[in-house]
Amino acid sequence: MEFLQLTMQNSAVTTNSFRAWYLAMRPKTLVSAIVPVALGAAYAFSQTSIEQFQKLPILLCFAFAIIMQIDANFINDYFDCLKGNDKPEERLGPKRACSEGWITLAAMRRAIVICTIIAAITGLPLIVYGGYKLIFAGLACILFCFLYTTKLSYWGLGDLLVILFFGLTPVCLTYYVAVPPALQTFPLEVILLALACGLVIDTLLIVNNYRDRDNDRKSGKITLIVRVGERWGARLYLLAGIIGELLLFYVVYTQNESKIGSMLLILYLLAHFYAYEKMIQLRQGRELNKILNLTARNIFIFGTLSVFALLL
């Protein structure tokens, strides 16, 4: 799979073609949108009967999350190109569509508008299940997409926002709309599950910023990794995964005391430790893109094992 994707990126890409849009969507990042919704849905299912479990809002949550992730990728691609942050000769990460000329800026602007509108239309029916207050949550998600690339990531707030918008918001709100009205609260277990999810997904941002730390420092992008340095940056990666896993272990064990479910979760830690060891060996440069791929895989492992453990 990695070879095929590299081949696709290195071969000629026709401007505004299907292949160009496929690459701009960054399919590997979609796991970060799917996992939080899956965790919120799994916990809701474990707390209700099949009859009480609300299935349609779960589908809407999945659709909203995926569309917003694609929208965020388009926005990031567009504004980084405008700012000159994705110069092909300097970029360490995967190639970006606008900077490479695969997609014109005008076409990307239209795509951003269309994605934002579709996401809003998709999320609007959720107010039937969770009330009008969900409108504010949806608007916050849309606002986050724009502010993260344009402002907030330059102030070192990226990690906090990932925990909020890839952990607390999607996990808690998915649970909220999936259960019957009598259960529409935010119990401690849901909040801890959401924090666990946010921390694990943040490992993807941490390794991305760890790779780009020198370029970010030069461009004035003061990420958390730029602030703490290489050594503590690697430790943050390790700790985020460990703390996230411990929180999940607590939720799973207190919910059903399933020893099998709890043991399953160890598999994620093994994968996380392996990625960390490779990360500190490679240290810098484009080789760290391998750790980015490993981390995306680990998030998928975390999500899959978590769902199984919650449902056992």
Q: Where in the sequence are the language-model features?
A:
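Topogenic membrane-insertion module of multi-pass membrane proteins
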Residues: 2-60, 64, 68, 155-158
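Small-residue-rich segments of transmembrane alpha-helices in multi-pass membrane proteins
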Residues: 35-40, 161-175, 197, 225-230, ...
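Membrane-embedded alpha-helical segments that form the functional core of polytopic membrane enzymes
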Residues: 38, 50-78, 135-146, 185-207
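Acidic (Asp/Glu-rich) catalytic motifs at the cytosolic membrane interface
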Residues: 67-92, 203-225
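Multi-pass membrane catalytic core of lipid/isoprenoid biosynthesis enzymes
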Residues: 88-129, 221-257, 297, 305
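Intramembrane alpha-helical segments
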Residues: 96-182
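Functional transmembrane core segments of multi-pass inner-membrane proteins
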Residues: 162-213, 231-235
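Extended hydrophobic alpha-helices typical of membrane-associated regions
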Residues: 256-312
